[in-house]
Amino acid sequence: RGFFVDIGVRDASLTRANEILGEQQLHLSALDFSADLGGLFASARGAPLAGKGRFDVVDADLRKLLPKSGVNWDAFTAHALRSVSATSEFRISGDTLSLTDLELSMDETQASGNLEIENLSADPTYHFNLNVPSLDLENFLHLSATGPFDGLMLLNLPAILVAQSEVTGLLKIGTLQSDGVAMSDVVMPLRAHGGVIVSSPITGRFYGGEVRIDTVLGVDGDLLDFRTRQQISQCRFGEL
């Protein structure tokens, strides 16, 4: 019981935001939000906001939206993360934001899954479960590493953005291309705490056999400490 309010936004563009330098690029095709009217008035007086809805972003330039992230964009290709689209159901409850049925599109790469962020106003805690049918790292990163799986380890790079937060999640990749090396059925757990990012064990199918990779990435300001162990078993490469 009670009164509810439905808010809808259509075909809106973000061009400038406080504390973000320069012009922005974000095109919001649709945003729908439903909340209890009394709760909405209470949130205007400082009470936690509660409600649910759906959004559809058709074009977002993450580089322009994250100018203070500290990410070295030189490690990425010229067009990587320049145009990202996303749709999702969402729910806000107090200090927690939940995204379900999340669908992401980054050029030729698609992803789907769920994301939950707790403690939005203080020290955020992230939980995610994402599935990527096919991923070619050369579409995103300049791969200058010498080892066959060094490109795979670079999947840890986005976690640098939240390295000082609490993060737990699972990334599954159906087919992964990295510097000419192909893997399938990749499962990558990730945990971050206090500037330390652990991905272990990363597992996948590799030319008839299996591969296991364990990585630990330490972030201290501008300094990175990257450690890894790679193990390959029962692979068949044919004639060399």
Stretches with model-predicted labels:
Residues 1-37, 41, 45-96, 101-110, ...:
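Small-residue helix/turn framework positions
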Residues 150-158:
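Long, charged amphipathic helices and adjacent flexible linkers at domain junctions
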